[in-house]
Structures are given as C-alpha cells and as structure tokens.
Regions:
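Short, positively charged
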Residues: 2-59, 64-269
Length: 269
C-alpha cells in the first residue's frame, strides 16, 4: 500500500473520530442525546440518523466542525444505486450517472474499481458504446469513471438536479435514507463551528430556510469537469476507499456557503 493511500486512510479515520468526539461534546454542553439508528425508508436495514443531537427543546441538530469556515466538508455520502432508487432515476439518465460516477456493476469489485484499464475499457466500449482512445489516463482510465465531457447525456444530469434542487438539498442535509416517520432521525437545524473544536463559536441555521433559498441557485458542471455544482452543494465521485465505496456520490458544502446564501451568520444556541 502506498504511503499516500495510508495517509489518506489515517486522515479519514482521524477526522471521523474527531467529529464523533466533538458531537459528544456538543451533546454534553447542551444536554442533548443522539437518536438510535432506525430502519431506512424501505424498512430493509438500519441507517445512520442525520440528527447528531436532540436538544431538550426538541430541535434536532446536525453538527459540523470544519477546519475553517471556508472548508468544504462532506455532508452526505451514498451509493449511486441507493440514490437513484430513492429518486426513481432509471433508463438513460441512470446510465449517465453510472458513467460519471463509475458505478456500473462491473466497476465496483475489489479488483475492478480502480487501476484496471482493460476492464474499464471493456465496459466503456461494449456496455456504453464509448470510444476510449481519447480518454484521460489520469482522470478517467485510472479512476474507472468518465468526466463530464465524455458522459453521454450529461446535460440531463444537470437538468435533473436543477428540477429537483430543493428535494435533493433536503435529502442531503436533513433526511438521507431515514424514514421520515422517525422524526428524531431527521435533522431540522445545522450547527457549524466557525473555529474548529470551539463550542462557543457554534452558529445555527434552520435547514428549511436553506432549502427555500436554494431554488434560486443554478446547477452546472464546474471547470474541473469532475464536479457538479448542485445549488449550494458540490457533488463529486468520492474517489477514496475500496471497491464500491470509491465510486460513491459525495456531497460537500461549507459554513461560508450557507452564510452567503442566507446573508446571515447564523444564530447562537
């Protein structure tokens, strides 16, 4: 295993542990508690609540502790399969998602998710009908996905996100795959630190206020051609982890982006 990959994994584990510790500090300070994991919206398997702390007043907080106010952090990760099932995405649009995220079933195995050029070219040519001669060795062949310029029907992805921007934002920030009948798992507030690990720096936003405002924002493909701007959110292929996790959808945003959208620094608790 390369030193770079080892460092990425250590960083990911360290960030997760740090985040969990801060969430517990938040709960202790405000007398909150974390809800239990409940069955998902299909009643098939338990899923992680979007709520990190239910405070005594009943508000349900999603707690974020970024390095700086401008740091974009992960706010939702999921497989293309579950996302498309949740939103009823099928047919040629689903195929476009699979091209962009590299989520075709033959690209999700431990030996095929990355650095398997022959298998990736086979999927491109025999499944998708994509000519592989001019694909980028670094950004496409190595990573077993297509960038936006080579995704057939990519404009339909952008259009779909534009037409569903409020529902997608609500999914990312408040619901995930939780059953909305289990209200304790559904976040209604976001609590962001403006100084890392500083409980006194926390600013709070109402998520429905965010959802109301994103309807005025545009969806487009960013200059890198590997990221969709979905209103407030940046959406990319995860690009880390092993197997199918490497090709997950990862949504990111920052405190400053929300502050700018609402023209509001957020309230204190």
């Amino acid at each position: 295993m390369s030193t770079k990959l080892q460092n990425q994994r250590r960083g990911g584990r360290s960030g997760l542990i740090s985040g969990m510790k801060f969430e517990e500090m938040f709960r202790v300070k405000h007398g909150g508690h974390k809800p239990d994991r409940r069955l998902d919206l299909w009643n098939e398997k338990k899923t992680e609540p979007k709520t990190d702390s239910i405070n005594p007043g009943g508000d349900r907080y999603s707690v974020k502790n970024p390095k700086t106010p401008s740091t974009e952090i992960q706010v939702q990760v999921c497989s293309v399969e579950r996302f498309c099932r949740r939103f009823g995405i099928v047919g040629s649009l689903r195929e476009s998602f699979d091209m962009f995220f590299g989520s075709h079933k033959d690209l999700l195995g431990m030996s095929t998710y990355k650095n398997n050029p022959e298998n990736f070219k086979r999927v491109c040519e025999s499944v998708w009908g994509i000519d592989t001669k001019n694909l980028s060795p670094k950004w496409e062949i190595r990573r077993c996905r297509l960038t936006a310029d080579n995704v057939r029907g990519v404009e339909n992805i952008t259009e779909w996100f534009q037409n569903n921007i409020e529902e997608v934002t609500r999914f990312v920030l408040t619901e995930s795959f939780n059953n909305t009948d289990n209200i304790e798992t559904i976040a209604n507030k976001m609590a962001w630190t403006t100084t890392k690990n500083d409980l006194d720096s926390v600013r709070v936003f109402d998520i429905e206020e965010i959802v109301k405002e994103v309807g005025s924002l545009k969806c487009y493909i960013k200059d890198s051609r590997t990221v969709f701007k979905v209103g407030l959110l940046d959406l990319q292929m995860k690009g880390s982890g092993k197997g199918s996790h490497y090709h997950n959808m990862q949504f990111n945003c920052s405190y400053n982006q929300i502050k700018q959208l609402l023209n509001d620094e957020g309230s204190r608790i």
